[in-house]
Amino acid sequence: MTPMPETSQTDRSALLAACNAEMQPERFKDYGPNGLQVEGRAQIRKLVSGVTASRALIEAAIDAGADAILVHHGLFWRGQSGVITGWLKERLRLLLSHEINLLAYHLPLDAHPVLGNNAQLARVLGLQATGRFGEQDLGFIGGRLDGETFADADVLSWQLEHALGRPVVAIQGKREPIERVAWCTGGAQSYFEAAIAAGAQAFITGEISEPQAHLARECGVSFFACGHHATERYGAPALGAHVAAQLGISHQFIDIDNPA
């Protein structure tokens, strides 16, 4: 779609349609609703993107004059009780009292080949995907964009910390040059076995659980937990900037830091 000249506003239905056209949420079996989660005002002048629909992000979006918020982690998830109390009540109160729309895309924003978290993390890390793996093809696998190899797991660990600006948890596999790297952002530690089966020499994700350390050592495949938030900072602003340019509205990414 050709970007529209910048105008003062669009309507909520056009914003939702633009996001859905890119994300194709109907293709995914997800843990919560994708698309519009909370309805606010009909006219949209400013879109704020962020990782999680936390109270801090909502308050920052209010201060920024947002009409809509676009996130990766929304408010509603499978298995919730459905009771609106406490922290959930407060987040909803802020959104509804300020008539702010909330849009959320979870797995669709992980999987998108250009705007998604995995694709955008690859851009930041200098990686290039040559294939997919795992349930719903959410995992990416490939190597360095420049065609070189990482000298070993220590070098890859240092480069991850340098690119993401935070320490990583690194479990050493074989001490060998690393050519084939797999990655899946966020809490995708359960994809490690699929990455091993796909032929990865190293796996990058956000979180680690107890079994992955043993698998890394026993299978000789290095495992890197780089932070759930840190690996998923890039999809929401990429999608937000993309649809804002299409619709001629303003966009701002607000990063609420999270050490997890």
Model-derived regions: residue spans:
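Active-site catalytic microenvironments in core metabolic enzymes, especially phosphate/sugar-handling
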Residues: 2-260
